[in-house]
Structure formats: structure tokens, C-alpha cells
């Protein structure tokens, strides 16, 4: 990512102010900061939801973003049809989606509801399906924004294990936004600390955690 910023014009506030960093293939990086630090804005710019006011962002690889897990579904489509819809939007061929279909259904634990319209699903069911699609479509870049709190404790552990697996075994690049320093340390070797839209630290994960904790105490 080259130096960029995002200005919120109605308050003349820069949500992200002259931030520049690079994440290499296979690297796992935690992004820390208090609410309003600019973390989610960075993720939205990386995924193309919004764009920087100046500067540029370059992304090389298939991005799977665990941001708003229940968004992007067609409520009138069945769960199965939505798997194909989201897979196509992520650039997969129908044959590739078909190969992954049962794995996605099994992970989401919604087999008996998969051929019902998504509008009949609970928010938890939609979140589980959204998570399952995004982690099982063989992403090259995985972006996670506090999405590991899906479902009950057993399913949360399952989600954590899955992210760990694809990051370690599949050489997926991970950008992980979290307030959990324990999870960040489990997944990542590098940490970036944001404060009031500015990047204040970029380096080894233990030091990043120390710096982040100091910002929380302020």
C-alpha cells in the first residue's frame, strides 16, 4: 500500500492519514487500534468498498473479506444458490464452486436449511454461511475484521482453527483486525498500530501488542 489517506469531508477529518505499508505474500499481519483509529476504513479501501482521497492501493490476488458476513446475500435465493452467487462474485467458475459446495455447507452446519430462502435464516445462520463461503473459496488474501465471534463457543473455536489452518498450510496472506491480542499473537508475526488515523508502529508482534496496550490505557 502506497501512502494514502481518506478524508471524511463533512467534518474535514482524515479517517486515514498518510498511511503506507506493504504486506507480502504469505505474511500474517495484525492491525491494532482503538475504535475510530482507521482500521476498518483501511480494510474497506483494500476491498474496494471505498477509495482513498489521495494515494493508491495495489492488491495482487483473490481477496476474501470477513467484514460484514451477512451482506451480499440475495434474500430470495436459497442458501445453495447464494453459495454460487457469492462464489461467482469472488471470481470462481461454477465447476470450482460445485467442488467446494458440500465443504461450505458442512462447515456452516446448515445442511437441513440449505435449500430454503436465506430470508428465512436467523442472523447467526447467515453469518455462519457467510464465514464458511469466505474461508473455503481458497482465498489468496484473507481479511478478517473481528469475524471470529460467529455463533456459540464451539463454532468460534472451529472458526479460529480454520483461519489458523489456511494461514499456516495454504500460505494465505492474512490482514487481521482484532482487539484480542492473544488471537493476534496466535496468527500473526507482525503488527501494525493505528492511532487517530495515523500509523504509529509497524513491526514485531510482541512490540506491537505493547504499543497497542499503551494506546488503550490513554
Residue ranges and their predicted role:
Residues 184-186:
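A short, surface-exposed alpha-helical micro-motif characterized by mixed small hydrophobic
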Residues 178-179:
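H-loop/switch region of ABC-family ATPase nucleotide-binding domains
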Residues 1-15, 205-217:
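Pre-NBD coupling/linker segments of ABC/ABC-like ATPases
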Residues 1-3, 84, 96-113:
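Conserved ABC ATPase "signature" region
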Residues 32-34:
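The feature captures the beta-strand-to-loop junction immediately N-terminal to the Walker
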Residues 196-197, 212:
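Conserved ABC ATPase "signature" C-loop
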Amino acid at each position: 500500500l502506497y501512502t494514502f489517506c481518506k478524508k471524511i469531508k463533512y467534518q474535514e477529518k482524515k479517517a486515514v492519514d498518510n498511511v503506507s505499508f506493504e504486506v507480502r505474500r504469505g505474511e500474517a499481519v495484525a492491525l491494532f487500534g482503538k475504535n475510530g483509529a482507521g482500521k476498518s476504513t483501511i480494510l474497506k479501501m483494500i476491498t474496494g468498498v471505498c477509495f482513498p482521497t489521495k494515494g493508491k492501493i495495489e492488491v495482487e490476488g483473490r481477496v476474501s473479506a470477513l467484514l460484514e458476513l451477512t451482506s451480499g446475500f440475495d434474500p430470495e435465493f436459497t442458501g445453495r444458490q447464494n453459495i454460487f452467487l457469492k462464489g461467482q462474485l469472488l471470481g470462481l467458475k461454477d465447476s470450482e464452486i460445485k467442488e467446494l459446495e458440500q465443504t461450505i455447507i458442512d462447515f456452516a452446519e446448515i445442511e437441513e436449511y440449505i435449500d430454503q430462502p436465506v430470508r428465512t435464516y436467523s442472523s447467526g445462520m447467515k453469518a455462519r454461511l457467510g464465514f464458511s463461503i469466505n474461508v473455503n473459496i481458497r482465498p489468496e488474501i484473507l481479511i478478517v475484521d473481528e469475524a471470529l465471534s460467529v455463533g456459540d463457543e464451539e463454532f468460534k473455536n472451529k472458526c479460529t482453527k480454520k483461519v489458523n489452518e489456511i494461514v499456516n498450510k495454504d500460505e494465505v496472506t492474512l490482514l487481521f483486525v482484532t482487539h484480542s491480542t492473544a488471537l493476534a499473537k496466535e496468527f500473526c508475526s507482525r503488527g501494525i498500530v493505528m492511532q487517530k488515523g495515523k500509523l504509529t508502529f509497524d513491526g514485531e508482534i510482541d512490540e506491537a501488542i505493547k504499543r497497542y496496550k499503551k494506546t488503550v490505557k490513554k
